[in-house]
A protein has these predicted regions:
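Helix-breaking motifs and short loop linkers at transmembrane-helix boundaries and internal kinks
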Residues: 44, 76, 97-102, 273, ...
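C-terminal transmembrane helical hairpin of 12-TM major facilitator-type secondary transporters
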Residues: 273-318
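A late C-terminal transmembrane helix in Major Facilitator Superfamily
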Residues: 326-365, 371
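Helix-to-loop junctions at the C-terminal end of transmembrane segments
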Residues: 64-76, 261-274
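Conserved MFS/SLC helix-loop-helix module at the cytosolic interface between two early adjacent transmembrane helices
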Residues: 63-101
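Extracytoplasmic gate region of multi-pass secondary transporters
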Residues: 33, 210-262
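Helix-loop-helix hairpin linking two adjacent transmembrane segments in secondary transporters
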Residues: 103, 132-133, 140-186
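Cytoplasmic helix-loop-helix junction between adjacent transmembrane helices
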Residues: 107-144
Length: 397
């Protein structure tokens, strides 16, 4: 990404920025699912159009993910992340109060565009400004706060009286995030990511790395599970006889397990050479969770959510691998810019397909069987993605 321009930031400031940014990476999306039916009634939209709302995050993440690295090359990591935060604040602040569905979609795009830039660039920003134990601690903070965001997002539907309030409330932490970036910008300077891979290795496309390709599909399949859960799980449970509040709590339970995964996974990766059992256990838990919803959703909805939550630890695992399997901020940014957009294309298409299949079949059977199959596919690619190799070395070979 060009020549490095790097300034040292105070550790406290690093942690504050990472905490606030990660806190806003899921709440603006996860808060939609519990009130999706109310939004559908308010705008008078079809199930297919509602499915579009659940697909937007993945598709926009893919598009903005492709733009994130070139944009950061031009203006720097911190400036790009600050600009994305501004878009997030505008979208979250205005989205609940519009009367046009088209405008609602446009403002949702602002929300997910801001989140998308942070999804791709925050790991590279952490790699750029952190080192040693601080780097591991920052990645732990990042993945943990992602779980907090996922857990808290659905609960706004329980605490707020209207769907508008449930969505708008998340503008407040986004404003705090914007203030933090305003403080960081003068100190960070034009922090273009630096790298260590030279020559052909620096120019070779990421798809020439088998591990990077496996990470793309692993990330994509786990993101698929996450966005189907955030977009459709509460509705699945409600239509199978579970109360609305319980359905919202079930989604929050998944987020609680993501918090645990955020704490555990960076630590686990930094200490274990062999991670093979991890994707096996997590993928099988995901499969079992979907199976429980299929055969007995109302019998133990929180148990099925807990299994999905354990399986959801694949997400912090995939994120932690971005820095653990690269040697430089440059390669981290390139890997993140390859893995996340490609993964989010898959994660965007599947939730959209869920709405279409549900509308065509009239129930959730085909959808849930398909999700169980995808869980097993995640197991297969996860075995390759967790191999202990460095992407830099594969590119230079």
């Amino acid at each position: 990404m060009g020549s490095a321009f790097r300034r040292s930031l105070a550790p406290v400031l690093l942690f504050v920025v990472v905490c606030l940014t990660a806190l806003n990476l899921r709440s603006g999306i996860a808060s939609v699912a519990p009130v999706l039916g109310q939004i559908q009634d308010f705008f008078g939209i079809s199930s297919g159009q509602a499915g579009l709302l659940t697909a937007l995050p993945g598709l926009c993440f893919a598009a903005m993910g492709l733009a994130a690295v070139p944009l950061a090359r031009r203006v720097g990591l911190s400036r790009t992340l600050a600009g994305g935060t501004l878009a997030l604040v505008v979208g979250l602040g205005l989205r609940p109060w519009v009367s046009s569905f088209s405008l609602f979609v446009a403002l949702t795009l602002c929300v997910v565009a801001g989140i998308a830039l942070a999804n791709v660039l925050l790991p590279a920003w952490i790699k750029q400004h952190g080192s040693g134990r601080t780097l591991v601690a920052l990645m732990t903070t990042y993945t943990t706060m992602l779980g907090v965001s996922s857990a808290l997002g659905p609960l706004s539907a329980v605490t707020q009286k209207s769907w508008q309030g449930a969505l708008w409330i998340w503008c407040l932490p986004a404003i705090a995030q914007l203030v933090a970036w305003i403080v960081v910008l003068p100190q960070a300077g034009r922090d273009v990511a630096h790298g260590t891979v030279d020559g052909a290795g620096a120019q070779r496309p990421m798809f020439t790395s088998p591990t990077a390709v496996a990470m793309l599909f692993f990330f994509g399949l786990q993101s698929t599970m996450a966005y189907v859960q955030m977009g459709w799980l509460p509705r699945m449970l409600v239509e199978k006889g579970v109360g609305e509040n319980t359905a919202s709590v079930a989604l929050a339970v998944i987020g609680v397990f993501n918090i645990a995964g955020g704490v555990v996974m960076p630590w686990l990766i930094s200490r274990l050479d062999r991670l093979t059992p991890v994707p096996i256990v997590l993928a099988l838990c995901t499969c079992a969770g979907w199976g429980g919803v299929l055969v007995a959703a109302d019998a133990a909805p929180l148990a099925w959510a807990s299994l999905m939550g354990i399986g959801g630890m694949c997400f912090p695992l995939a994120l932690a691998l971005l820095t653990a399997r690269t040697r430089s901020a440059l390669t981290t940014a390139r890997l993140s810019g390859f893995v996340q957009p490609g993964g989010y294309i898959l994660a965007g298409l599947v939730p959209l397909s869920v709405g279409v299949v549900r509308g065509a079949t009239g129930d959730w059977t085909a959808v849930l069987i398909g999700l169980m199959v995808l869980s097993l596919c995640m197991l297969v690619v996860g075995l390759r993605a967790t191999t202990h190799v460095y992407i830099d070395d594969e590119l230079a070979a």
